[in-house]
Amino acid sequence: MNDPTTPLMKQWAQVKRDHPNALLFFRLGDFYELFFDDAVIAARELQITLTARNKEKGNSVPMCGVPYHAAENYISKLIRRGFKVAVCDQVEDPKLAKKLVKREVTRVMTPGTTADSQLGSEENNFLAAVASHGDFVGFAALDLSTGEFRATEFKGSDARRRIQEELLTLRPREILYGSSLPLFDAARPANAVSGAMPKLATVEGASWAETPLEDWVFAPDYAIPLVENHFGVLSLEGFGLANKASAASAAGAILHYVRQTQRGSLHHVDRIGFYERQNCLVLDAVTVRNLELIEPLFTNTGEGVTLFRALDATMTPMGKRLLRAWMLRPSIDTSEINARLDAIEMQVVDTLGREELRRAMDGILDIERLLSRVTLETANPRDLLALAQCFGRLPKVRAAMQRFTSARFLVLHGLLDDLADLRDRIFTTLVDEPPITLNDGGVVREGLDAALDELRNLSHNSKQFIAQIEERERKRTGIGSLKIKFNNVFGYYLEISNANKHLAPADYERKQTLVNAERFTTPELKEYEAKVLDAQEKIVEIERRIFGELRTAIAAEARRVRQTGLALAEVDVLANFAHLAATRNYCRPKFDQSGEFELIEARHPVIELPELTGSADRFVPNDLYLNATTHTVIVLTGPNMGGKSTYLRQAALVAVMAQMGSFVPARSARLSVVDRVFTRIGAADNLARGRSTFMVEMTETAAILNTATDRSLILLDEVGRGTSTYDGLAIAWACIEFLHARTRAKALFATHYHELTVLADELSGVKNYHVSVKESGGNVVFLRRVEPGAADKSYGIEVAKLAGLPAEVIERARAVLKEHESVERQATSHLSKDERGSDSMQLTIFTPLSQKIVDQLKETDLNRLTPIEALNLLHELKKQLD
């Protein structure tokens, strides 16, 4: 950095030294200016002009600037790109400054602490922290924009993996960690260096800014008292954190960081919850992605083709966020689930009441985020007025809720405060249409403060008073063109043309000479100017005080306001579920302890909606039955495009919806609670981390086999296709046997390996199903019905024909297939039909040439093999073939 020489640049350098890792927005008059490297970065990122100071002196200082009234938009862009921004404001009136205007950093904004109005309404903006103590790794996350605060911790060798899984699900914007704590295996750009450039990390599609802090910030002796003091308690036992030192330390580190970067009371952060993943239906990042819960797998399908978009008809921003939260963490508590279902059922049968309730919530803005700006002291007059308007709708919401007497609605009705006292105070304090800022006054309603009214009267009557002086001076001087004007440099002055300046009285004091006129003042005019300007300054001062008192009063009631926002969010989601159930013919799922999972005429909640998919085809519903004994694994065969993947996904989506507490798209649903949903659907190379398609497939499959329980639901689609036919078939075979014998989880296994269908004859819990196809005139019609039994062929060539492969290729493929089918029939002609297992026309890998290997396999107890042992056996068998 060049040595600053002017007093202004010395002041800038002193502030910058305190915030070396932030872009410094330095207030100069009506602009925020940035200098040196900050200016170069900001000009590039914001696409604004880069200029320089002191060019002529040979000591050029790069600089750029943005208007102060538009700064929030520019700052938001930088925050979204991972930068930190320190805002340095003028904290005294430039007119009153004796020398250099005093400036201070009034706020520091980071990706994880921003609470600005441009945040997406449906998602949280989490700041996370990771703390490690011995065998424990603690994790905490705070959404400063809403006040949501949570913490957990894990123990053992897989603790860091589970924390990473939590991060991938939660997707925070910023992570705090001890400077000596190694973080996760992540892709980090080369620009992740010291200075203002953000330190960004990307892990499996999720990106966040990384902020290292000194290790002492995470020390329990320092961090835990911060949490206790914030909540005003002697012990964290009431929050479930009494013996969770790592989790509490992570939470304390967050509070430390927020206190350093923000001002305000943080009254809206009024609670913290300890949670454990096993207390909800666990959906890891792979499952969330594969089921397209929040984001589509392929962007060209449009942002609407997700479960969230399909289920989101909420009326409020808080409802959207709660819907998303319930979707990512469905309940496993049947009492909680049924309480929600009871509330929904009562609304489904009362159409008028349901719609009245939804209309009452329509137009309610983001109470949680408006409140956060109040407590952080960044709320402007329009924010407070917006809050009051939201509060004004609450009596209608409470009145509409009285029609519904389910237990959960009665609780929510009691939690929902109409906040009439705060509403009335805001309305009686602020004008109907206040300006955004307090800089020019005009915010406080007339009649509220006598001193303010008196000053306003003086200021507002200035035009009339000046007109009277002007008319009097015209008569006294005989100058008909004499005018009294005002500007910010000279204040009030009398302007006389050159032709009449000789008529100016002796008591006129010359202020400025122009080409065509002279400007004068008088003692009377100077005295009045001082009164008017002083009045305007005092008006702004009084209005700031009154507004500050109002904002403080609301912040003091943050607990009431936030509780109302949370209750309103739940009312909104439950009314939303009732609306969907009534308009889409959903049914109420019934939960029991039988271990069964039975769906009658179930539908895919997204694909059945033509407004999202753009398809005019009628969706074909299907049944599904799984249990803990005779139907634990379904082997699903059939052609591509037949609907296998849709069938798998809709089973999982129904489970997720049901445990969110929603009605589901089916004629009937009888379910047992699921503890985890696993998916292995599709494949994608991760070459950046040296992982091939097959390695990704095997890693995900291994995680499923190692962690699934007998209460899990597993979806496996084409396991083994990422390698050779023989290897893939062997792995798929071993996986089914392992699922059947070891995990006893409910599993749907879609495959093109028709050889796997013989397992249904050997394993009591395995059942064959297929997606049906109709052949007509050499063409195939996909009926998309799932029926018992194995498919008789794959129809791969027919699908290739539909895809438009050249006729020559199709004909050659038919000839090759016919030749291989002939070889297969000859190879198995000595076997009985029972020994062959079926009349399948698929190629078999068990020919006379490999009879020795077949015998070896028959002698092997596959039920006692682990997946790794199965792979080793496969390797040995392949060596024999070679």
UniProtKB/Swiss-Prot annotation:
Keyword Nucleotide-binding: yes
Keywords for the protein's UniProt record, in alphabetical order: ATP-binding, DNA damage, DNA repair, DNA-binding, Nucleotide-binding
One GO cellular component, as annotated: cytosol
Record-linked InterPro entries: DNA_mismatch_repair_MutS, DNA_mismatch_repair_MutS-lik_N, DNA_mismatch_repair_MutS/MSH, DNA_mismatch_repair_MutS_C, DNA_mismatch_repair_MutS_clamp, DNA_mismatch_repair_MutS_core, DNA_mismatch_repair_MutS_N, DNA_mismatch_repair_MutS_sf
Alphabetical list of Pfam families matching this protein: MutS_I (PF01624), MutS_II (PF05188), MutS_III (PF05192), MutS_IV (PF05190), MutS_V (PF00488)
GO BP of this protein: mismatch repair
GO function term, MF aspect, one: damaged DNA binding
Sequence similarity: Belongs to the DNA mismatch repair MutS family.
Reported function: This protein is involved in the repair of mismatches in DNA. It is possible that it carries out the mismatch recognition step. This protein has a weak ATPase activity.
Protein name: DNA mismatch repair protein MutS
Organism: Koribacter versatilis (strain Ellin345)
UniProt gene name: mutS
